[in-house]
């Protein structure tokens, strides 16, 4: 089995992981010279390309010097923790990719810890050494310190390192000498990554991932730990609770380049995809038909946040989306549960409302954004952090927060974090910038990014990861300003918007259609204010023609989905449709709102 190497890639968002895989694919001649491929071949759903993050793990196989290398791409974000753990189960070694300027970042820590615990051998790639002011040697030391902190074993600390620039297509053992290709990296993989360890015994495979195809149904993906598989072979599927379901394999596929190829036989140690099994979940074992033995199932991080999903019942419902009923939304969420391991779904006493639990705002907003693009309309409530009761004490999730920002604005940022019950752990100057580390409740992180970017003129870089549950730290002040709420249904008239500008900032553009109870702006004071922006100017003969003022309107504030979710208050929803995002009050009628308050 020396002809196979299984390796996972770990990297922080935007350190060049997907670019590196592109170059490996090109080097191993996966594309004929006449094929044009986009950049970032792996990030193949639109959301991933736009945000520059990898959400779902992918598998790619290349052949180099007669040896098959299975490359498994991992999500870098702690929000997708569920994905990370099960993917690492398939690998024998990891490629840790770090930026030569930024060094190892908090998100990298999360995945690396999981990899070291699974006893995988690390290879370090210091990427982007062509950047100005980068410090590859210091980064190498920082990686060593990080692994030492994470209690790596001695053989893991003795890791090989390669330097280079994936974008410019070269890698080398010494960062000062540029080479012609990325071969030194591939040679290092062959030399240092152990071949899969093959145990004697009956067939065993843990299902670590799944795929779906409209004509073959669900496809189980995993690594065959021992034994072999053949087409039309009878197997036993062992569920998490130990029950056994006799099944039969219809088709077997191995990974080949970016796709798969159909085979009749798979040996232990290789990654494969199986068609024809029914009713399996991630974490089940495919075992021998006569003498089935289960593999230990995968433990997944618990969710830390919940959001209310409900049907769109605003006056504009059904105008923009295809799927608007609660049945559609429920079916879509149940489908998501099958492949999104870190997510949980809970029904409420109302048929139209669902509570969805996830790993953070990013994890859930990616789901909402995907649904929105598929044509769903829905409304989302304010994100709620999950508070637990442990030994009779109220506990809440605490996160480790790293902020990298210009030195002259660091004081203001530190003040913001401490107001949100954050405590400072360290402050390190890095050139003209400061890197500050804090411990802060998850509740304090919701909405922090917007404020930070405003205070630092967009220069702050913020990363956070889940640390632990600890004692509840008391109330955190939310948004100080109230909302401007529309009084009438109609279109926003520039004349009215102009007259109300001193009352606050608007979220709607002139002539945009609005409805009663929609949040159309932010009040400059604390409480909510109901305004009428549908009034036109009276054209009676009383006014002199020459004394008209020209209307000067500030451009409206536009939110992204995450910003909108972090902005809303408890009594507000975000209305999500394929073509617009609107903020609204839960109760559209003002008298009803007053009654609920009283």
Regions found by a protein language model. Give the residues of each.
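Canonical P-loop GTPase G-domain recognition
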Residues: 121, 131-192
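Conserved structured catalytic cores and adjacent interaction surfaces
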Residues: 2-19, 91, 101-113, 119-121, ...
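Interdomain boundary/hinge elements
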Residues: 36-42, 150-162, 196-206, 242-255, ...
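Alpha-helical scaffold elements adjacent to nucleotide-binding pockets in ATP/GTP-utilizing enzyme cores
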Residues: 23-24, 61, 83-86, 90, ...
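P-loop NTPase switch module centered on the Walker A-proximal segment
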Residues: 1-98, 102-104, 138, 142, ...
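Residue-level signature of catalytic and energy-coupling elements of molecular machines
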Residues: 14, 20, 52, 71-73, ...
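Conserved nucleotide-binding/hydrolysis modules and their immediate coupling elements
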Residues: 204-307, 315-319, 414, 481, ...
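A short, contiguous, amphipathic alpha-helix enriched in charged residues
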Residues: 314-337, 550, 554
């Amino acid at each position: 089995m020396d002809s196979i190497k299984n390796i996972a890639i770990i990297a922080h968002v935007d350190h060049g992981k997907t670019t590196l895989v592109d170059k490996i694919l090109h080097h191993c001649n996966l594309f004929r010279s006449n094929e044009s491929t986009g950049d970032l071949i792996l990030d193949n759903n639109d959301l991933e390309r736009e945000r520059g993050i990898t959400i779902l793990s992918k598998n790619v196989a290349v052949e180099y010097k007669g040896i098959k290398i299975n490359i498994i791409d991992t999500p870098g974000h702690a929000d997708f923790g569920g994905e990370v753990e099960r993917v690492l189960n398939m690998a024998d070694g990891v490629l840790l990719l770090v930026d030569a300027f930024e060094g190892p970042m908090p998100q990298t820590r999360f995945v690396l810890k999981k990899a070291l615990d699974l006893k995988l051998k690390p290879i370090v790639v210091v990427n982007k050494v062509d950047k100005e002011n980068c410090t590859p040697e210091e980064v190498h030391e920082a990686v060593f310190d990080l692994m030492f902190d994470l209690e790596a074993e001695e053989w893991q600390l003795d890791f090989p390192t390669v330097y280079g620039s994936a974008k410019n297509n070269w890698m080398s053992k010494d960062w000062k000498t540029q080479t012609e290709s990325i071969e030194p990296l591939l040679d290092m993989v062959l030399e240092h990554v152990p071949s899969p360890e093959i145990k004697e015994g009956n067939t065993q495979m843990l299902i670590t991932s799944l795929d779906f195809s409209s004509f073959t149904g669900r496809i189980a993906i995993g690594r065959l730990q021992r034994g072999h598989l053949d087409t039309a072979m009878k197997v036993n599927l062992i569920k998490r609770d130990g029950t056994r379901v006799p099944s039969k394999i219809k088709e077997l596929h191995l990974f080949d380049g970016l796709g798969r190829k159909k085979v009749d036989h798979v040996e232990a140690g290789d990654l494969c995809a199986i068609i024809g099994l029914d009713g399996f979940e991630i974490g089940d074992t495919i075992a021998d038909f006569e003498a089935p033995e289960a593999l230990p199932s995968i433990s997944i991080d618990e969710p830390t946040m919940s959001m209310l999903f409900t049907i769109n019942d605003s006056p504009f419902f059904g105008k923009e989306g295809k799927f608007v009923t609660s049945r559609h939304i429920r079916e879509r969420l149940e489908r998501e549960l099958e492949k999104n391991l870190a997510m949980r779904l809970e029904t409420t006493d109302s048929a139209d409302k669902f509570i969805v639990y996830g790993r953070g705002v990013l994890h859930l907003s990616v789901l909402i954004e995907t649904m929105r693009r598929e044509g769903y309309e829905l409304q989302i409530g304010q994100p709620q952090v999950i508070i637990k009761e442990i030994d009779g004490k109220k506990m809440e999730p605490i996160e480790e927060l790293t902020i990298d920002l210009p030195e002259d604005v660091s004081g203001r940022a530190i003040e913001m974090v401490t107001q949100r019950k954050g405590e400072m752990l360290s402050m390190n100057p890095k050139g003209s910038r400061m890197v500050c580390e804090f411990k802060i409740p998850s509740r304090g992180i919701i909405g922090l990014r917007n404020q930070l970017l405003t205070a630092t003129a967009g220069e702050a870089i913020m990363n956070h990861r889940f640390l632990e549950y600890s004692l509840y730290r008391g109330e955190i002040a939310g948004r100080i300003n109230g909302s401007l709420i529309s009084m009438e249904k109609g279109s926003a008239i520039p004349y009215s918007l102009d007259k109300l500008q001193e009352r606050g900032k608007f979220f709607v553009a002139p002539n945009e259609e609005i409805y009663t109870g929609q949040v159309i702006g932010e009040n400059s004071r604390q409480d909510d204010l109901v305004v009428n922006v549908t009034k036109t100017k009276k054209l009676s003969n009383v006014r002199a023609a020459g004394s008209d003022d020209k209307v000067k309107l500030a451009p409206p504030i536009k939110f992204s989905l995450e910003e909108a979710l972090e902005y809303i208050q408890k009594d507000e929803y975000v209305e999500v449709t394929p073509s617009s995002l609107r903020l609204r009050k839960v109760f559209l009628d003002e008298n009803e709102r007053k009654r609920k308050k009283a």
